[in-house]
Regions:
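Bateman/CBS regulatory modules and CBS-like beta-alpha motifs in cytosolic regions of diverse proteins
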Residues: 28-44, 51-53, 82-120, 127-129, ...
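Alpha/beta catalytic cores of nucleotide-metabolism and tRNA/nucleoside-modifying enzymes
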Residues: 1-24, 104-105, 166, 176, ...
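Active-site-adjacent beta->alpha loops and helix N-cap segments on the catalytic face
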Residues: 30, 79-88, 146-150, 194-214, ...
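Catalytic cores of alpha/beta
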Residues: 60-63, 235-243, 282-300, 340, ...
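Glycine-rich phosphate-binding active-site loops on the catalytic face of alpha/beta enzymes
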Residues: 67-82, 245-257, 296-314, 344-378
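Short beta->alpha transition motifs characteristic of CBS
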Residues: 74-79, 122, 126, 133-149, ...
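Catalytic beta/alpha-barrel core
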Residues: 73-77, 103-104, 124-126, 164-166, ...
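Short beta-strand/loop segments at the ligand-binding rim of alpha/beta enzyme cores
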Residues: 43-50, 96-101, 160, 216-226, ...
Length: 491
């Protein structure tokens, strides 16, 4: 028996190997429905997720992508307290009603109030007594010209004729109250004047500006966070849950392993209300294994990322489009979504990834260059770039991602075996601009396929193409004089 017949079980295809075949269409791109599932219980308004990488997703980017309708996954290359604070920052960025507002106790000093305003980046704080009952509110306006930092806030706060409302007040009524009284913050109290929340003009305005934002039932932006399989995993999980995280992502290089499932089962047993995404995998067998263990979504991609070297260092992986399709077939009927992670270069790749069976895509390099990403800004040859590195790069592993590659027991940096590189990507401007182009391309693809929604896109057909077909697909036989905002062949 030949080697191919005996050991080669499949032909692996990726994005450049295929094109979607256009179909009869009655749908315009602007009218397609982009809603999808991130995990079993979390709905997205666009099928886009930012990667749990330390040069991609921290609070600033997570806030920005949630406002556009996607979700960000805060990376774990930081202390437990820092990651929990990042989650809290996202959860406090927007609210229908703030259920746990920052408060200050009466008797505190002006200096204390100013410090809290600076720490939480807020312009006003409700003042409460020891029992949590509202006694006043102190704002920037009250403190603007105050020179005595030791003066009690009781003397400067607004305490007469306080405008408050009850918990049953809806946002439209709250907006009218704020406008009528020309105030920006509306304390919410119970029948005994105990503070139970806060409604702000800023949050109402943000909700109107971004109606498709990904939010929880309390009107707060959704956010996920990455965790590993290491000695302090459950301490980290507990802190993230306390911080209000919407989903946990067990982020490893090889999700089809006993250690990962052991962690998954423990998390689901302890926190059954928190969705748990597990990855990364590349086969249908792995998907079934994780679903049986309780996964609320699976993340697909072994080595397709631009900064990943797993396939050449370990010799392991499955070309991404085939991996997505294989896992999608295994997930049929389970209700468990598939997140396609890695290998995306253009918006057309996103269309292909979803058409092959994905529910959403996870983006690293496509978002690493935006101004909201935490990567360092670099000027090189007169052009602006941002740093971008794989979580399997030596630099990232030294900072804390060793456990992702099952090397957390290794302290000697010389004995680490990296599966990624450090790089740079061109600066791209704001996340909004990038997402706008990605979503626009995705809508166009759905229109060409005649798909009203993502479920219909899953029925689209592909054609396999040659290298000549790939060359023909790109601009050719011309010199590009001005780049489009959604197309580039590299630096």
């Amino acid at each position: 028996m030949s080697f191919i017949a005996d050991r080669v079980v499949m032909d692996g295809l990726t994005f450049d190997d295929v094109l979607l075949i256009p179909a009869y269409s009655e749908v315009l791109p602007r009218n397609v429905d982009l809603t999808t599932k991130f995990s079993r219980n979390i709905t997205l308004n666009i099928p886009m997720v930012s990667a749990a990488m330390d040069t991609v997703t921290e609070a600033k980017l997570a806030i920005a992508i949630a406002r556009e309708g996607g979700i960000g996954v805060i990376h774990k290359n930081m202390t437990i307290a820092e990651q929990a604070k990042q989650v809290q920052t996202v959860k406090r960025a927007e609210n229908g009603m703030i259920y746990d507002p920052v408060t200050i106790t009466k008797g505190k000093r002006v200096a204390d109030a100013l410090a809290m305003m600076a720490e939480y980046k807020i312009g006003g704080i409700p003042v409460v007594d020891e029992g949590g009952y509202l006694v006043g509110i102190v704002t920037n306006r009250d403190l603007r010209f105050e020179k005595d930092m030791n003066r009690s806030i009781d003397e400067v706060m607004t305490k007469e004729n306080l405008v408050v409302t009850g918990q049953s007040t809806d946002m439209e009524a709250a907006a009218q109250i704020l406008q009528e009284h020309k105030i920006e913050k509306l304390p919410v109290v119970d029948s005994h004047n105990k503070l139970i929340g806060l409604i702000t003009y800023k949050d109402i305005t943000k909700a109107k500006d971004k109606p498709k934002a990904c939010k929880d039932s309390k009107g707060r932006l959704r956010v996920a966070a990455g965790v590993g399989v290491t000695f302090n995993t459950f301490e980290r999980v507990a802190a993230l849950v306390d911080a209000g995280v919407d989903a946990l992502v067990i982020d490893t290089a090889h999700g089809h392993s006993k250690g990962v499932v052991d962690v998954l089962k423990q998390i689901k047993a302890q926190y059954p209300h928190i969705d748990c995404v597990v990855g990364n995998i590349a086969t249908g067998e792995a998907a079934k294994y994780l679903v049986e263990a309780g996964a609320d979504a699976v993340k697909v991609g072994i080595g397709p990322g631009s900064i990943c070297t797993t396939r050449v260092i370990a010799g392991v992986g499955v070309p991404q489009l085939s991996a997505i399709y294989d896992v999608a077939k295994a997930l049929e009927g389970t209700g468990v979504p598939l997140i396609a992670d890695g290998g995306l270069r253009y918006s057309g790749d996103i269309v292909k990834a979803i058409a092959a069976g994905g529910s959403s895509v996870m983006m690293g390099s496509l978002l690493a260059g935006v101004e909201e990403s935490p990567g360092d800004t670099i000027i090189f040859n007169g052009r602006k770039f941002k740093s971008y590195r794989g979580m399997g790069s030596l630099e990232a592993m030294q900072k804390g991602s060793k456990d992702r590659y099952f090397q957390d027991v290794e302290d000697d940096v010389k004995k680490l075996v990296p599966e990624g590189i450090a790089a740079r990507v061109p600066f791209k401007g704001s996340l909004y601009e990038v997402i706008y182009q990605m979503v626009g391309g995705f809508r166009a693809g759905m229109g060409y396929c005649g798909a009203h929604n993502i479920e219909e896109l899953h029925k689209a057909r592909f054609t396999r193409i040659t290298n000549a077909g790939v060359q023909e697909s790109h601009p050719h036989d011309v010199a590009i004089t001005q780049e489009a905002p959604n197309y580039s062949r590299g630096e």
